[in-house]
Amino acid sequence: MSNKINPKRREPTVAAAVAAATAVVATNTSSSTGSSAGNTSSANTSSSSSSSLSSAGGGDAGMSADLTSLFECPVCFDYVLPPILQCSSGHLVCVSCRSKLTCCPTCRGPLANIRNLAMEEVASNVKFPCKHSGYGCTASLVYTEKTEHEETCECRPYLCPCPGASCKWQGPLDLVMQHLMMSHKSITTLQGEDIVFLATDINLPGAVDWVMMQSCFGHHFMLVLEKQEKYDGHQQFFAIVQLIGSRKEAENFVYRLELNGNRRRLTWEAMPRSIHEGVASAIHNSDCLVFDTSIAQLFADNGNLGINVTISLV
């Protein structure tokens, strides 16, 4: 049996939101009229408006909290944000869930492309909590700022940065290193801003990853060397450094990778990636040190490749 949500719970919710939006508009109109009539009239209007808001939700904070709950999607419990569409009975569902549904999850009626302008007006006057509030974020934002904030929120959960491990772990930034040390014990950590990253057996067939940690300046950096087959028989190496930290922290550093030997030198210098961003997109766009197997053989010694890594403060 499917868990059908009682439609009666949503209908008064939308009605309450419309009433609240009307109250807000009425309050603004009354305040404007009272102001033009004089100070005494303005004071009376202000008192009346304050009383009205208080009864609606216990003041501005209470009202905002009450209204926010009206925007919960009945499927995923995230917020339904503008543009807001409703079914023919007035029930709401978020855009993400709507694309996966064939009928309204509340009344099982047909989904319709009907804009709910009243709810959109309410949404423009409500502040929504960050979706990472469970990880400690206390920000409250208008809906137009919500997505941008959440993409760079310092409290957002981080994915495991270890490439090729298919690790499903995610958690707060301050637990990333603990996870790596407990679950990926094979990763070696070297101290200092100048180290040699030694990748062994680079002639192994297929896609291979080499990973090492570097600790300096009070931070940890993950050094990654990936070998991929880009197209038939043509293999390439991609070397990159990412900071176990935020994007803002990464802006304080620059890393330098250098292959050196046999009177040849190949270098790359850039700002480290944050684990917010990961390394996949940088590798896909070749925004890192890139060289093919023939270049690798010029610097390799018995199948082993040493990469000099230098981390510097900007």
UniProtKB/Swiss-Prot annotation:
A zinc finger (SIAH-type) spans 125-185. The RING-type zinc finger domain is essential for ubiquitin ligase activity. A zinc finger (RING-type) spans 73-108. It comes from Drosophila virilis (Fruit fly). Zn(2+) 2 binds at residues 160, 167, 179, 184. This is E3 ubiquitin-protein ligase sina. It is found in: Cytoplasm; Nucleus. It catalyses: S-ubiquitinyl-[E2 ubiquitin-conjugating enzyme]-L-cysteine + [acceptor protein]-L-lysine = [E2 ubiquitin-conjugating enzyme]-L-cysteine + N(6)-ubiquitinyl-[acceptor protein]-L-lysine. The gene is sina. Its EC number is 2.3.2.27. Residues 27-55 are annotated as: Disordered. Pathway: Protein modification; protein ubiquitination. GO terms for cellular component: cytoplasm; nucleus.
